[in-house]
């Protein structure tokens, strides 16, 4: 198999990829939407690479309430922080759509015997960059959920998505329930607020496709 198009393997050559094979246990799997890849509470030993599709990182409390912390798209990784630090997973990784996932045993990749290898240095450098990107994504969610109203959370999130897309027309990686879980609001209340915002001419939407028309007064 050729080197997957993923951020964690940036700069890894075909030769280095072949050298990495014996260092860890790699497994490829197909996951239907809604299927759990890493279960909350289980020991963390592997990281996942999204080859196609997408994954939601979520937390479920003792009462069964779900919060989506982030979305991981194709070419991105998940679970690497917990695999490096060990212990039980405080979150779950669930397929957001039909997805192809590569799972890798992290401890094997970081063994001291490979310290002089070029691929390990590249891998560690890539992981540092990934950590920084994920810290930024976490900050973005904190900004969204700090707004006191559903409309405020929607505007913060959708505005950020528009900036990232470089256009007032864009797609988001969530369906309605996933968006509600990400913003930590009730789905029915979210749908009603979206309808009101559309009626007021603030935006248009169809499924996960949005068009921002104008900002409300005062913003």
Where are the regions that the model predicts?
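Phosphate-/nucleic-acid-contacting segments
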Residues: 150-153, 157-219
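Short helix-to-loop capping/linker segments positioned immediately adjacent to catalytic or ligand/cofactor-binding
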Residues: 91, 111-120, 137-146, 164-167
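Cyclic-nucleotide recognition modules
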Residues: 24, 70-129
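An amphipathic alpha-helical interaction segment
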Residues: 126-136, 153-160
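Cyclic nucleotide-binding regulatory domains
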Residues: 35-97
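Cyclic nucleotide-binding regulatory module and flanking cytosolic helices
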Residues: 1-36, 82-84
């Amino acid at each position: 198999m050729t080197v997957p198009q993923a951020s964690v393997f940036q700069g890894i050559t075909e030769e280095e990829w072949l050298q990495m094979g014996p260092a860890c246990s790699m497994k490829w799997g197909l996951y239907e939407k809604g299927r759990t890849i890493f279960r909350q509470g289980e020991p963390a030993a592997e990281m996942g690479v999204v080859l196609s599709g997408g994954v939601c990182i979520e937390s479920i409390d003792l009462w069964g309430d779900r919060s989506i912390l982030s979305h991981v798209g194709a070419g991105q990784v998940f679970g690497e922080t917990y695999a490096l630090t060990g212990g039980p997973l405080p979150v779950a990784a669930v397929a957001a759509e039909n997805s192809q996932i590569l799972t890798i045993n992290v401890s094997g990749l970081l063994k001291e015997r490979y310290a002089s290898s070029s691929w390990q240095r590249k891998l560690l450098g890539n992981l540092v960059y990934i950590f920084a990107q994920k810290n930024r994504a976490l900050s973005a969610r904190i900004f969204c959920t700090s707004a006191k109203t559903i409309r405020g959370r929607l505007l913060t999130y959708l505005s950020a998505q528009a900036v990232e897309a470089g256009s007032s027309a864009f797609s988001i990686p969530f369906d309605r329930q996933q968006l509600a879980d990400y913003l930590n609001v009730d789905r029915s209340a979210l749908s009603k607020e979206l309808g009101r915002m559309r009626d007021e001419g603030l935006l248009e939407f169809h499924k996960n496709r949005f068009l921002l028309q104008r900002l409300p007064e005062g913003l």
